[in-house]
Swiss-Prot record:
Protein name: CTP synthase
Function: Catalyzes the ATP-dependent amination of UTP to CTP with either L-glutamine or ammonia as the source of nitrogen. Regulates intracellular CTP levels through interactions with the four ribonucleotide triphosphates.
Organism per entry: Bacteroides thetaiotaomicron (strain ATCC 29148 / DSM 2079 / JCM 5827 / CCUG 10774 / NCTC 10582 / VPI-5482 / E50)
Binding residues for L-glutamine: Y56, G357, L385, G386, M387, Q388, E408, R465
Species lineage: Bacteria, Pseudomonadati, Bacteroidota, Bacteroidia, Bacteroidales
Other comments on record: CTPSs have evolved a hybrid strategy for distinguishing between UTP and CTP. The overlapping regions of the product feedback inhibitory and substrate sites recognize a common feature in both compounds, the triphosphate moiety. To differentiate isosteric substrate and product pyrimidine rings, an additional pocket far from the expected kinase/ligase catalytic site, specifically recognizes the cytosine and ribose portions of the product inhibitor.
Length: 537
């Protein structure tokens, strides 16, 4: 195509309007037209990455294949576009400032006074263009976190202003705002959007496209009013009303010609509108699945915020669609789970997920849930800490080591069936120091994991410091828990399963990060299938 085109997505009026979904939808529509697209997220917080952030603060921490702890929006990008993102796809203010300070310490600025303009803004611009320069993408979509008007966003907005001036038609700004509905007046109000656009204009940015988030449809008159007072073309005002599922948003945007408008404004041929056949088939199958009785699956964990397990929820949802059933996820707070109430808490559950996490809080409830599902032969899927809890519960109640534990929870345990990894022992810093990113795993032929994947060699993403202690491996296998997935370099146990049960698997890695709309993860598909079969019985 020639020069890379840059699309900036900003937000106004309120946070959590769905900039990530709009960015992903634009990317999907352009990708369907044959363009090579990637999406990056700029977060205005001063943390280097979200790796040490509490999930209640920021939702789940997503992990890229190259081992970067990233914003959960990267999960949306990957699920929608079916691409793999990297460290370069998620930048924070902390990383920008650290890079500038490191350069200053090296003497790269030759004694100049370091300022927000031009040094910070130049570093932001360099990172915006990095993906386009390095990988030759046709489009780089850049989502700016936060809301226009926030102090933290100002350097990013100034950088966008400069890039729009420098790049001309190769840069475009999409501004997402909120149009509230006042029930008392019975009407939608556009004034907040007008003020948000004026705020953007005050820093020198004229948005090219407006996406209006609303609970009710906008009339043509209302859209024309917004276009007139915000200085954009009529057809460049697009509504984004609430949809049944986020996966319908690309089709809603396409129906209003959003992708055509973007191409036209960037001087590119519009051509025929792509059919998005596989995407539409997925949605048709999803709608058909929703007409049936849902399959109930419990998610046992300590974070009751839905975004804390975002990728797991999406992976379960996708797996349900490909099993032609809607998955109803029931969160079960592990802090409140006891031997006395576990039967009631898991009543009616066709399958149980043991969620990932860190630390002692809520872990005893996970042991209770695992013991119950193991002894009642309920399909169970444990991820990361969930897999470690499966191993600990088995050691306590099957191997007979009542005081078995993880070194993370009890440094003095005499039976450390989960131990800290050797290379982690000398590490003191928390941020970015775990075993992160994609690693190889070899599956045991004939195992349920192997049957799910249909291949022997796989690669999955990790985020952990502790591992299964191979000193106990022979005892586990003799008692009925098999180690069926092994890293060929370190001999680290990646997958355990109990073959005698219907479906009882724990993975040290995070399979949810690799599940996409058009390619659901095989372990999740197999787990949901097992839950459906269990429900029949």
């Amino acid at each position: 195509m020639g020069e890379t085109k840059y699309i900036f997505v900003t937000g106004g009026v309120a946070s959590s309007l769905g900039k990530g979904i709009i960015s992903s939808s634009i990317g999907k529509l352009l990708q369907a037209r044959g363009y090579n697209v990637t999406i990056q997220k700029f977060d205005p917080y001063i943390n280097i990455d979200p790796g040490t952030l509490n999930p209640y603060e920021h939702g789940e921490c997503y992990v890229t294949v190259d081992g970067h702890e990233a914003d959960l929006d990267l999960g949306h990008y990957e699920r929608f576009l079916g691409i793999q993102t990297t460290k370069a796809n998620n930048i924070t203010t902390g990383r920008i400032y650290k890079s500038v300070i490191d350069k200053e310490r090296r003497g790269d600025y030759l004694g100049k006074t370091i300022q927000v303009i031009p040094h910070i803004t130049d570093e932001i611009k360099r990172n915006v263009k990095l993906l386009g320069n390095k990988y030759k993408f046709d489009f780089v979509i850049t989502e700016i976190g936060g809301t226009v008007g926030d102090i933290e966003s100002l350097p990013y907005l100034e950088s966008i202003r400069q890039l729009k001036w420098e790049l001309g038609k190769n840069a475009l700004c999409v501004h997402l705002t909120y149009v509230p509905y006042l029930a008392a007046a019975g009407e939608l109000k556009t004034k907040p959007t007008q003020h948000s656009v004026k705020e953007l204009q005050s820093v020198g940015i004229q948005p090219d496209v407006l996406v209006l988030r609303a609970e009710h449809p906008l009339s043509d008159g209302l859209r024309k009013k917004v276009a007139q007072f915000c200085n954009v073309d009529d057809k460049a005002v697009v509504q984004s009303i609430d949809a049944e599922t986020i996966y319908e948003v690309p089709l809603l945007m396409q129906a209003q010609g959003l992708d055509s408008t973007i191409l036209e404004k960037m001087g590119l041929p519009v051509g025929e509108t792509p059919g998005l056949g596989p995407w539409r088939k997925f949605l048709e199958r999803r709608h058909a699945a929703e007409t049936k009785e849902p399959i109930n699956i419990a998610l046992v964990g300590k974070y009751d915020l839905q975004d804390a397990y975002k990728s797991i929820r999406e992976a379960l949802s996708q797996a349900g669609t490909y099993n032609d059933r809607k998955v109803e996820v029931h969160f079960v707070n592990s802090e409140k789970l006891t031997d006395e109430n576990v039967a009631e808490a898991l009543k009616g559950m066709a399958g149980v997920m043991i969620g990932p996490g860190f630390g002692q809080r809520g872990i005893d409830g996970k042991f209770v849930a695992i013991k119950y599902t193991r002894t009642h032969d309920i399909p169970t899927f444990g991820i990361c800490l969930g897999m470690q809890c499966i191993a600990i519960e088995f050691a306590r109640n099957v191997l007979g080591y009542a005081d078995a534990d993880s070194r993370e929870m009890d440094e003095k345990t005499p039976h450390n069936v989960i131990d800290i990894m050797e290379e982690q022992k000398a590490i003191t810093n928390m941020g970015g120091t775990m075993r992160l990113g994609a690693y190889e795993c070899v599956l045991q032929k004939g195992s349920k994991a192997y049957l799910a994947y249909g291949e022997e060699h796989i690669q999955e993403r990790h985020r952990h410091r502790y591992e299964f202690n191979n000193d106990y491996k022979a005892q586990y296998e003799a008692a009925g828990m098999k180690c069926v997935g092994i890293n060929p370099e370190s001999d680290l146990v990646e997958i355990v399963e109990i073959p005698a049960l219907k479906w009882f698997i724990g993975t040290q890695f995070h399979p949810e990060y690799s599940s996409t709309v058009l390619n659901p993860h095989p372990l999740f598909v197999a787990f949901v299938k097992a839950a459906i079969e269990n429900e029949k019985n």
